[in-house]
A protein has these predicted regions:
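Boundary at the C-terminal end of the N-terminal hydrophobic targeting segment
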Residues: 26-28
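C-terminal or internal capping secondary-structure element at the end of a domain, subdomain, or sheet
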Residues: 134-172
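A mature extracytoplasmic/lumenal domain signature
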Residues: 40-42, 49, 83, 88, ...
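N-terminal targeting signals for Sec/Tat export/insertion, comprising classic cleavable signal peptides
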Residues: 37-61
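Surface-exposed helix/loop patches within compact recognition domains
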Residues: 56-134
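Amphipathic hydrophobic-ligand
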Residues: 41-45, 121-127, 156-163
Length: 172
């Protein structure tokens, strides 16, 4: 091999290594463990994503959306409600989404499972809670759960209890 080719390869390897070292800590920081139980059938939740958005009740503050799923969700789908609902309807993922305000209150929830149909199970309820461990604008960690067994609009019983930690992606 020519010295110039070797040097070029070495530069590529070093650049890739540096890039990977920046990505790995963020990915390693995101973790989820728990379950979503729909109609007596448990689903293990292993993925978590979090992103900031403009506050619904106070535009000067930010809300954080936490998406907890049993399978990876492509980045473009994470913030796209219609694409997200398509994944749910086809049974490719099962998810719990909570929108949490600056006061650490769940102001909206969505439980995505094909058993609920295309609309899913969503709304606002004090029965869906977030118990914060970390909530500093950069990281969100804690427990997302239902206080008691719930019933969907179609009378399908469900509960969830998930602990998680995730880096918060900035507003877009």
């Amino acid at each position: 091999m020519k010295p110039g080719m070797v040097r070029g390869r070495m530069v590529q390897i070093v650049v890739l290594g540096i890039g990977a070292s920046w990505i790995v800590p963020v990915a390693a920081q995101n973790r989820a463990e728990g379950k979503l139980d729909v109609d007596g059938k448990p689903v293990a939740i292993t993925q978590v994503y979090a992103y900031a958005k403009e506050g619904f009740f106070d535009k000067k503050k930010q809300d954080v959306v936490v998406l907890l799923c049993d399978a990876p969700v492509p980045a473009p789908v994470m913030r796209d409600t219609f694409a997200y609902k398509d994944l749910i309807a086809t049974g490719k993922v099962h998810c719990v989404r909570q929108t949490i305000d600056a006061d650490k209150q769940v102001i909206n929830y969505d439980v995505g499972h094909q058993r609920f149909g295309s609309l899913g199970e969503n709304g606002g309820s004090t029965e869906h809670v977030f118990e914060a461990q970390t909530f500093d604008g950069k990281t969100i960690a804690g427990r997302a759960r239902t206080k008691s067994p719930q019933k969907s609009f179609k009378d399908v019983p469900y509960t969830y209890d998930i602990t998680f930690s995730a880096a918060i992606e900035p507003k877009k």
